[in-house]
Every structure is written in C-alpha cells, then in structure tokens.
Curated annotation (Swiss-Prot):
InterPro entries: UPF0182 (IPR005372). It is found in: Cell membrane. The keyword Transmembrane helix applies. Its main location: membrane. Keywords: Cell membrane, Membrane, Transmembrane, Transmembrane helix. Belongs to the UPF0182 family. It comes from Clostridium botulinum (strain Loch Maree / Type A3). It is a multi-pass membrane protein. This is UPF0182 protein CLK_3152. NCBIfam families: PRK00068.1. Coiled coil: none annotated. GO terms for cellular component: extracellular region; plasma membrane.
Length: 893
C-alpha cells in the first residue's frame, strides 16, 4: 500500500506533464520570442496577475468547500445515513485530494478569465464624463461594472453548485446506507432526511443566494443605461420611473430577506426562509407587469414629450463616444462661380486629382511589376510624399513573396531560400502613360527610382503576406532578387530571430511538428528562426487587447520599408451610446510601426485623452511610447484611418441631428452616397477617398479623407464630411452642409448624368461594342472655394483573361458643363477657357462639319487594330497603333 502511495505523486506529475506537453513547449517558445522582441515584461504581466490571483482564490475555494464538507459530515454522523459506514480516514483523504484539484482548477479558470478585468478595475482612469441618471463617471461602467458582473455570476454559480452537490451527496449516501442496511428507499422521508442532513447549510446558502440576488438587481439598476426598451438606446422614461423604482425595492427587500433568513437559521426556524423567497419572486414578476403597464398606458400616447430628455442623453453621449462632438460644422453655399484665378490658386489640388483607381492599378501592378510568378502585391496604399520638391499624392505597394506560389514548394525553398520580398512600386495618382497605365516613379528590381526618396534596403521580411517562419543565416544563401538569367543572393543582416541552438531546434521541431529542424544540415548555431512575421498577427501577439485596422500601409523612410497599423481602443460599455457593429465607443489611440527588415514593433500613443489607452499603459508598463518619440518622417505619414472614418460616417448619418424632437420623428436621416463601378452595373456604398485639397478657408493643400452624404433613400447629396491629417491638423473633422433647396449631384447622380449625355453615351456604347468593356474609376468630388468639381476616370478593358484595364478618358463636370477629355488639364481648359458655353457648342458643331471623312476612317482603322493587338497581348503593336491614332486625332484637332 505504501509503495502504491509513493508512486502516486510522481505518476500524477508525469500525467500532468504529458497532458500539458504542447502548452509547455509553446510557453517556452513564447518566452524566447517575447524576450527577442523586448516585450517579455508584457507577456509576464498576464502570468504574474494570474498567479497572484490564483493564490487567494484557491485558499477561499479550498477552505469554503472543506468547511461546507465538514459541516455536512457532522450532520451525517448524527443522522441515520451513517449507520454501517466505514469510519476510516480514506474518505477524508480522497476528498482532500478532490478538493485540492477542484479548487486549483476553479482558481485557474477564474484567474485566467478575469485577471484582465481586475487589473482594469485597479488601474481605472476617469473619463471626466458622468452619466445623466446615476451621475457616475463613465470609467465606472467601462472598468468596474464588468468586474462586479463577473463576480456576481461566479458567486451565484458557486452557490447553486453547492446546492446541487449537496443533494447529490445526500442521495448517494442515502442510497449507500439503504443498500448496506437492506432497507427500501422511502420517498416520503426525503424531506426530513434533507433537513437532517443539510438543512442549515442549505438555508445559509439560500440566504446568500437571496443576498446576491439583491446585488444582482443593484447591477441591473446600473445596467439600465444600456436599456434598449425605449425609442433610443439607454434608460427611457419607463426604465427610470417604473423599472428603476421596482429594482430599488427588490434590492432593499432581498437585502432584508437575506438577513431574516440568516437569523431564522440561528433560531432553527425555516418558514421565514420560504416566505422571503416567495416575496422575492413576487416582486420580480410584479416589476415586469408594472413596466408593461407604464409603457403602454402612460408613455405610448405621450412618447415624444416624455422621452425627449432621454433621447437627448442618447444623442449627447453617442456623439461623445464616437468622437463626433468636436466636428466643425459649416454651411457650404454652392455658387459655382470659379474664375481662372481660382483655378490657378488651387493648382496643387487640381494637379493631385486622382485619375488612377485602386482596383485597376492593383491589377496592373500584379501583371506588370511582379517580375516573377512568386511575387505578389497584396494591396495598394495611398499616401503623400514631397517628391522632388512637390507635394504629391501617390499609390505605392510592397512586393512580397507568395510562398504558396513557389514551384517546387519544398521545405528549403519555403523556409530557408525564399525568405523575403523585395522592393516597392510607386506612381503618382494624377498621371498615366500614353497607353493609360500608371506612370511609375519607383519600379522594377532592383528599384528604378525617379524620386528623391531613398530606398537602399528594400527587403521585406515582415509584411502582410509573410505568414510562415523563415530560418536565416544558414549554409544556403537566401534568394534576394532575380537578375537576368541568374539570381542575386543575400545574407540576413537584421537583428530579428531566435538562435537555433540544439535545444531550440528540438523545441521548434516539436512545436511545428517538423523533423526537418533536426535533420537539416543547413542550419548552423548562428542560424536564427524568425516567427510571427505577419505584421498584424505580430501586433496582436504583443497587444491582443487592441483592435487593429484592416488596412496596414507602408512608408518608405531611412532607406527601408516600414509598416503602420492603426490600433483602436473600443468598448461596448459606454452609457447611453448607441452600439454599432458591436461597439459603442472607439478611439484611434495608437499607431503601430513595424520595421520590415528587423521586425522592430513600436506602439505610439496618438490620443493621450483616451482613458482606455491610458488604462492599458498603466497595466502594461513599457508597452507604449509617446507619439513624439516616433521619427518625424514617420509621423508625417500618419493617416486618418478609413475603418474609423467609416463607422463614424455610419453613426453621423443618424446622429448629426441634435434636436430630440427631430430625432424622434426621424425627419433628417442621412446615408453615405452610393456609387456605380460599371456602366449599367450595380450600385454600392461609395468608398471614402483620400484627396489632396485646399479647404475653403485655408492657404495650403492637405490630405483629407472625404465622404459624401445623401438624404436617406434619396440620391441628392446633402453634406460633405472630412477628416484632416496633415501636421497639427491631424484628427480634426469638418462637416460641410450643402443647401437642401438645390439639387446637388451625388456620385450616383453624377453617373446618371454621364449616362444621359448623348455624346458621352455614344462614345461608351462604341467602346463596349468593339469587344471591350468600359469601367468607371473612383469618383472624386473636389470642393474648390464655393464650388464642386466632379471627376470620373474611364477605363477600357479588352476581352480576354489577362487583359489590363487602361485609363483612356476623364469626365469632368462643373456647374452644367460635362466634358469628356484625355486628361484633367485638357478638361479644365475646356470647361474654364470658354466664357460663353453656347458659342463653344456652336464652334464644336462647326468644327465637326469640317472634319475630313478619310481621317475619321483612318482613325477608326487604327483604333480597331489597337483593340485587336490588345486582345492578343501584343503590347508593342498596340502602342504603335495607339500612337498613330493619336497623331491622326491631333491633326483633326
């Protein structure tokens, strides 16, 4: 027996080790990785919190269960159920082990589930905003109330668990006794047996349950600020005047009932316990009835008047929660009275009008600039750079390795040789080549660079497509980039990675379930494994409590490529704020900057006023840096994030209204404008463009994220919503309200105007008939002074699998003028150089009469040849025919 006991503990430890083997390996690797990225203290913050919490919670659980068990055993020994039972200590030892395991398990579950809420509670930061019902700071609801709710659920669950296990224990012991004593089970004696066995214990537990029902209704009182019963989110008239009153009564009565219950136990009386439970149930049922009666017989017929103060609470706090309370609102009286001087004064804005569109440009990149089949461009970013002394908006993208495309896709190729992408491409958004393709300023491998932007180390070890580990500094040289018939190789000179000692090779062989770590002769002691290379997953691994933007963007700085990811703090616990997409508060509180070569990951706080990010900073010391610590050249490229702007636009469509009466009537609802990408195609919500523009009262151009609003379910544009992002203007928002008594074309109405123009529609029909497809680009509506200039690029795509869309024409519209031109500059000249549109139209008709028919036929011939060459992929012939067509058209002109 002693030998068996001696073997039990080591056997138990071995079983635990086997059960948690993979977790142990993963834990060791995590320690090594967090140490490598200099965030080990962040990783240990969670572990330290869990361990510190587990100790007192384990003691509480262990002692509570043990004392409860002892009290049951005392009653058992006095009762009939104990006759004939074995009285040795084996049962006590068994229960001790059981209690120890259960208490450890429960303590771990609780600590690992709620460590974060406890730390948030302890490091609470005031919002300096109070809710209008209970006058508590918002921090109470965001940082403290969630912990109270969690504790309530855990304690109620534990008390119910004790009740259930008490009944189970009684029935097991009763059944055991009856079997041993060979007596029949009498159901009539169960009530007496339970009272004798655990009457006091169950009464105490019942008293505690009633006490915590009181606490639960106190939580329900606070949760009224999230009520959805009224016409707006948050506590309504019924909630405040009926539900709240009953909740308060229930809190008081249940508190008294719990005291009465405990006193009754001391006196040995159980009837008051039943009465208290009955009263509690009656009050809970009565509350629902009372709320129903108030809502239907008092509120319903007077709803607009009674609900106004609560609607105002909802409006004010929703606007605060989504950072819409600081929008600068201005009237934009459309005059359309631009002069030539106004055009000259806004030359930088006009020179940066985007005629390249996202989707066609990405297609072109992935056909022309991937160089080799194993490269890819994941997406295109838009940014602004000073190029050769001029402020330019550009498209740019990183050329990453697509390891899934490798052929052969061997372990060495995937993890040792093709370790990184190479280079970037950049083109100005406002210019195309004579063939209608993006006009590159940075392209090719090695980079051909026409700018003053240095790119001396264009390697990409960390990116959006780098989803696998690589091993660097091996005996095999890494593939760097292709050069004619040979390949350039490279040795990694960055500091990322974990050294591949034998122990580490063994750990990763187990972790990755790959024996190659041990068998490969290419791995040296100095070799390093680089893991967590996907930039978003890397940021999430370090700071999983932040929400990350769906579109990281690249920046070229100091000769290298860097990535910027917008990080958000969110909650769904902001009082009175209407939830959107599962949240009712959001701030872009941090920017994550990642080096594409070294993998250095830095978190910069960009919104010091946000209490949630300050709460995180107190919990995770050393994680965040101040914004000023980021290099100036990086800060210049911080963008206002589109994900945030999108949700703010959605909220603004309803919450631009500040008057509760108008809000109640739903009189003034907006929606983001619709747009159409294909001629006769479906409509979709317009994608907010980043544009370079000079705000009406400003002297300098800047990049602005702009959205266009319509009246709900109408196509008339009603407002322009912009977010600024250059220099000290970063984060400022402005709303231009357009005149409601005029028809202002939205992007969709602008498309309809194009389709209804006889000259343009004929041109579009001609292109579509020639075996090609006409596609619209990205619609831009540019405010200039008190006028709106509309721009629509037109793309032509030949039929065929590998056809490339090409930007062939630009449609411009100003006031009542609509022109189809080969470029922005030509279109501007055509619109603004004619003082009398009627004379201009007459001249056009006269010039049409004098055109030589033979030249028209020749132009049509070269056009048809060009289309045929495009279909066949003969780009040399295509270019020649287009040039000939251009010469003929110039002669006609």
């Amino acid at each position: 027996m002693k030998n068996r006991k001696a073997l039990f503990i080591p056997l138990f430890i071995i079983i635990l080790f086997i059960a948690f083997f993979n977790k142990i390996i993963n834990f060791i690797i995590n320690i090594k990785w967090f140490k490598e990225v200099n965030y080990l203290t962040i990783y240990f913050t969670k572990m330290r919190a869990i361990i510190i919490l587990m100790i007192p919670i384990f003691i509480i659980f262990f002692i509570s269960i043990w004392m409860y068990y002892k009290s049951l055993m005392i009653n058992k020994n006095k009762s009939v159920v104990d006759i004939g039972l074995n009285k040795n200590n084996y049962g006590k030892k068994l229960f001790f082990i059981f209690n120890f395991i259960v208490s450890i398990f429960l303590a771990y579950i609780f600590s690992s589930s709620y460590w974060y809420r406890i730390l948030q509670f302890n490091n609470s930061v005031d919002f300096n905003v109070k809710d209008p019902i209970f006058f508590k700071d918002v921090s109470f609801y965001v940082f403290k109330l969630p912990l109270f709710e969690s504790l309530y659920k855990v304690i109620i669950s534990l008390l119910l668990f004790l009740v259930i296990t008490t009944f189970i224990a009684y029935f097991i012991l009763e059944a055991k006794y009856k079997i041993q004593s060979k007596k029949d089970i009498n159901l009539k004696n169960i009530n007496h047996g339970i009272k004798s066995f655990a009457g006091k214990q169950l009464a105490i537990v019942s008293g505690l349950i009633i006490l915590f029902i009181s606490f639960g209704h106190l939580i329900k009182i606070w949760n009224l600020v999230y009520s959805s019963n009224g016409v707006s989110f948050g506590a309504s008239y019924t909630d405040v005047h009926a539900t709240l009153l009953f909740y308060k009564i229930i809190v008081v009565i249940t508190l008294i009932s719990s005291i009465v219950t405990l006193l009754s136990i001391v006196k040995g009386k159980f009837k008051p316990v039943s009465i208290c439970i009955g009263i509690t149930i009656f009050l809970i049922v009565s509350q629902n009835i009372a709320s129903f009666l108030v809502q239907n017989f008092i509120v319903k017929s007077n709803e607009k008047t009674l609900e106004q103060p609560y609607i105002k609470n909802n409006i004010d706090l929703t606007r605060k929660a989504f950072a819409l309370d600081d929008i600068e609102i201005r009237d934009f009286d459309i005059k359309n009275d631009l002069q030539k001087q106004d055009i000259a004064d806004n030359k930088a804005s006009i020179d940066n009008i985007r005629i390249n569109s996202f989707k066609p440009t990405l297609e072109f990149y992935n056909q022309v600039q991937i160089i080799r089949y194993y490269y890819t461009f994941n997406d295109i970013d838009i940014d602004r750079y000073n190029i050769n002394g001029k402020y330019n908006q550009v498209f740019l993208a990183a050329r990453e390795i697509d390891t899934d495309a490798l052929n052969p896709n061997t372990w060495q190729n995937r993890h040792l040789i093709y370790t990184h992408g190479f280079g970037a491409v950049m083109n100005k958004v406002n210019s195309v080549t004579s063939e209608g393709q993006p006009d590159f300023v940075i392209k090719d491998i090695p980079p051909y660079n026409k700018t003053n932007i240095k790119l001396t180390n264009p390697r990409i070890y960390f990116g959006e497509k780098t989803n696998d580990y690589v091993i660097v500094n091996t005996k095999i040289n890494e593939f760097d980039y292709p050069k004619e018939d040979s390949n350039k190789t490279n040795k990694y000179n960055g500091h990322a990675g974990i050294k591949m000692s034998f122990i580490n090779r063994l750990l990763f062989a187990i972790n990755k379930k790959d024996i190659n770590f041990l068998l490969s002769k290419d791995i040296k002691k100095d070799s390093k494994i680089i893991i967590n290379r996907n930039i978003v997953e890397r940021a999430k691994k370090i700071a999983p409590f932040l929400t990350y933007d769906s579109d990281p963007y690249m920046v070229i700085y100091n000769g290298k490529i860097y990535w910027i990811i917008d990080a958000y703090t969110t909650t769904n616990r902001y009082p009175y704020s209407e939830p959107y997409d599962g949240i009712n508060y959001i701030r872009n509180s941090a920017k994550v900057v990642i080096d594409s070569v070294d993998g250095d990951t830095n978190f910069y706080i960009t919104d010091k006023k946000d209490p949630i990010v300050n709460n995180y900073a107190k919990i995770f010391k050393g994680l965040f840096k101040e914004e000023k610590d980021a290099p100036k050249e990086i800060r210049e490229h911080f963008r206002y994030p589109k994900d945030l702007f999108s949700i703010q636009s959605k909220v603004l469509g309803k919450y631009h209204v500040k008057d509760p009466g108008v809000f109640y009537n739903g009189e003034d609802l907006w929606e983001v404008s619709k747009d159409q990408k294909h001629v006769e195609g479906e409509t979709n919500t317009n994608d907010a463009p980043y544009i370079i523009m000079k705000l009406p009262d400003q002297n300098k151009e800047e990049m602005v994220l702009l959205n266009y609003f319509n009246v709900m379910k109408k196509d008339n544009m009603i407002a322009l919503f912009g977010a600024r992002m250059d220099g000290e203007q970063y984060g400022k928002k402005i709303l231009y309200k357009l005149p409601s008594d005029k028809t202002v074309y939205s992007p969709y109405l602008f498309k309809q105007k194009i389709n209804q123009d006889t000259n343009i529609s004929k041109e579009l029909s001609l292109w579509n008939r020639e075996g090609s497809q006409v596609q619209y680009g990205d619609t831009i509506i540019l405010p200039i002074k008190n006028s709106l200039l509309y721009i629509e690029p037109l793309y032509l795509r030949a039929s065929g699998k590998n056809s490339i869309p090409e930007m062939k024409r630009v449609i411009l519209s100003y006031n009542d003028r609509l022109v189809l031109s080969s470029s922005i500059q030509e279109g501007i000249k055509e619109i603004f150089n004619s003082k009398d549109n009627k004379i201009n139209d007459k001249n056009e008709k006269d010039s049409t009469k004098t055109i030589d028919d033979s030249k028209l036929k020749k132009a049509q011939e070269y056009y048809n040849k060009a289309i045929e060459a495009q279909k066949n992929g003969d780009w040399t012939k295509y270019g020649e025919d287009i040039n000939e067509l251009g010469n003929i058209l110039n002669n006609i002109k």
